[in-house]
Amino acid sequence: MSPNRIMRMLQAAIVADAFGVPYEFKQRGTYTVAPEMVGGGFWEQAPGTWSDDTALTLALLDHLTHADSYAKLMDRLTAYMETGAYTPTGQLFDIGNACAKAIRTYVIEQAEPTMCGDPSEFANGNGALMCLAPLAVALYAEPRFVTRAKSYRAYTQMTHRHPRAVLGSVIYLETLWQLLH
């Protein structure tokens, strides 16, 4: 896969996220979508500001680029939560409950990174899905589904350990992987 294709995909995801920030937490049908980048919204952010979705995706990309340990990725997620790393302004304005809980579990309990996610039935939001798309790209050349699925599972469990969340990630990431081929 060419670096240009990867960059275009990343840029599209970041722009789409920034377009969506002003509409977070709004009920469908209660607003008009602007045809240009606007600010405001629940978080009162400047136009073009991306959300935790992109920030955590950038943290994962940083991790994958350096090919380092799961602990190093959790350190990056911690830096996002504590210092606003990977944000356009250097300030965190949102983080999902399950992701925040997983980071606290890692920091406070010093848990194994792939065991930090909440295993409860109620920890089944899209928090894992929102940032894991780069895994499909990173595993582009991996021909074995079992190997890919193990990786999808490990990364998902860092923030979401319920089997439903893991299965959702496997289906989502494998669909992306298939689309890339």
Where do the model's predicted regions map?
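Structured, active/binding-site neighborhoods that engage oxygen-rich ligands
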Residues: 1-181
